[in-house]
């Protein structure tokens, strides 16, 4: 009793816990702010290193230009880590396109895939037309071209003319490759050749041909030969991205229709996609060094940078202002109008992809990084990104359309050619279509510029005058292309979210039904086994269990508590 009272009189210990927010810190607030900044930089370490690499490459390149002329081998060694980065990124393009398209489309039905593709194409065409029209308006308003520039820059190099019809037919041919393996490293192109054709009389009569040869030896003028332009199809180096995308879109849709039969293949490509994305993460940690070396090497290799900047400064400003307006105002505005979400928080999520595009100048090379930014940072459904991004990296080139429209009218202004309304519309439409057909590789805009200049009858040799500044503008327009693809994925995901949720609920219901069927089959099997176990001793009156005899009841299912030891046990 005394012990009980002593226990009751003991002081009770009460543990009081307070939330961290109620505790005052002795550390100054500015230190907390600094620690928060360090924590944020730590979480975004890769992004911070990439931005630092861009700045470091530009600063080092500018300082090295001030030094004495650098040997080309030294420049090559400086840019070598950047070349390795580009090779690694391009190495992943093919497996990433294959796995992403198949896994994205196999999880959708045919109707959902069609709606997804329609929304993406409407967005692509709309933004590309807006970019081309913006470029035309800016170049006409600023008027950077001047006939005096043509005299300062000198004549350009002669280029082969390209037919718009041939380019369009090549686009369709590449969409349907005859050999899928060959499409991984080659694409088809129409080539025009000038061939000397002898007159028919020379071909028909061998005697006259011999006489003609004798006349040539006797310094007599032979019959004139004709120059005939012949067209032919040739394969050129470069991945046929358009053909691969077309095939694997059809492959993914067909696999999605097969349902459970293709489950093993879907799992295989899902695993392949995950492996590729893990490789992407490894390469991204190398990208700050590679991007710094790429930019530094490019700046060192430029000849007469100051002279080029003075001569083509207004042209560069026109293109850059147009890209900033389109990528910084129009695209975020379209995203906000459609989704009613903050476009700048969206841009913060894709900043890593934007910086990578600025350094590599390749939409296809940036594709692995763009996948990771949209899926991990912004939480966009993989079925959307895996379909929208590969297609967008190939045909959605807003920055390229704007650049080509500005460049074409700039060349016209340099040559003193005044374009009428019809020609300006032609430039806008051709720039839109040419940007869609441009391959997602560096400096593809210069190649497609031939189409636009040929369409309005401008000299194609003047394209070579713009090569000196294309290294910078190519990076700027590629970064806008990547931003446009990313905003497009966000818009398509917002418009398709309800349909994707419906598909997910249907899949869950189907899985529940399959699980219920499996459980019922399992229960039936167990029930049959239990019945068979109960009846196994039905023909016996007693059994021996643990050295004891158990007498069974008449029904053979239960014992009447008649348990006795065996006689020899009792005798012991």
UniProtKB/Swiss-Prot annotation:
Protein name as it appears in the record: Excitatory amino acid transporter 2
Intramembrane segments: 344-374, 424-457
SUBUNIT field: Homotrimer. Interacts with AJUBA.
Highest taxon, organism lineage: Eukaryota
Compartments it resides in: Cell membrane
Domain observations: Contains eight transmembrane regions plus two helical hairpins that dip into the membrane. These helical hairpin structures play an important role in the transport process. The first enters the membrane from the cytoplasmic side, the second one from the extracellular side. During the transport cycle, the regions involved in amino acid transport, and especially the helical hairpins, move vertically by about 15-18 Angstroms, alternating between exposure to the aqueous phase and reinsertion in the lipid bilayer. In contrast, the regions involved in trimerization do not move.
Organism: Mus musculus (Mouse)
Keyword Cell membrane set for record: yes
Compositionally biased residues, Basic and acidic residues: 14-28
